[in-house]
């Protein structure tokens, strides 16, 4: 089950979920109890498949208190995954490290110039947070999304990013090409 949060620190040129950036839109607001009641309809499936909830966005690591409260409701049997840019303060990652089971990290590109041109921000926080997760033994719980973004990076750039990430200890990648307008 995917839960999308509103708000993101990045302004990617081809945002895959631009409604998460809109100040108004068609959003259903849930508190933790309401969300739990809604998604627990799938609990038998979660337990049989080792599944759970993926928090995406926007940026889920800007919603730490909500995720912490949700974990208390669902217990340790459900897997909690965050689909994140990791472009948040380190403290946000530290606060949830014992709560989050898996990470899907949209790295964009390891080259800071490419990353900044595409997102409007530098990738220093991303790399710091990624190193922290690896140091804490989470490398096997991380899938890195390494997109080819037309007009921003090349196949060579993606290859180089993957090589650098492998050197850091990452083994799981989701390589794909953005469909651009």
Question: Where do the protein language model's features map onto the residues?
Answer:
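Canonical Radical SAM [4Fe-4S] cluster-binding loop centered on the CxxxCxxC motif
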Residues: 1-30
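Flexible, glycine- and charge-enriched loops at secondary-structure boundaries
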Residues: 25-32, 119-123
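Conserved AdoMet/S-adenosylmethionine-binding subsite of the radical SAM
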Residues: 40-179
């Amino acid at each position: 089950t995917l839960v999308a949060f509103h708000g993101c620190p990045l302004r990617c040129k081809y945002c895959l979920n631009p409604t998460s950036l809109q100040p108004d839109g068609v959003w259903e607001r849930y508190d933790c109890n309401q969300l739990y009641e809604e998604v627990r309809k799938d609990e038998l499936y979660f337990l049989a498949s080792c599944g759970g909830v993926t928090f995406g966005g926007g940026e889920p690591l800007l919603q730490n208190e909500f995720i912490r409260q949700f974990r208390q409701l669902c217990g340790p049997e459900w897997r909690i995954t965050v689909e994140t840019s990791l472009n948040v303060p380190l403290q946000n990652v530290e606060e949830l490290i014992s709560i989050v089971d898996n990470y899907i990290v949209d790295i964009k590109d390891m080259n800071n110039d490419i990353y900044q041109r595409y997102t409007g921000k530098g990738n220093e926080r991303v790399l710091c947070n990624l190193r922290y997760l690896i140091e804490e033994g989470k490398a096997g719980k991380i899938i890195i999304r390494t997109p080819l973004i037309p007009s921003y990076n090349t196949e060579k750039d993606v290859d180089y990013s993957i090589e650098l990430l492998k050197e850091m200890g990452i083994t799981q990648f989701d390589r794909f090409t953005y469909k651009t307008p």
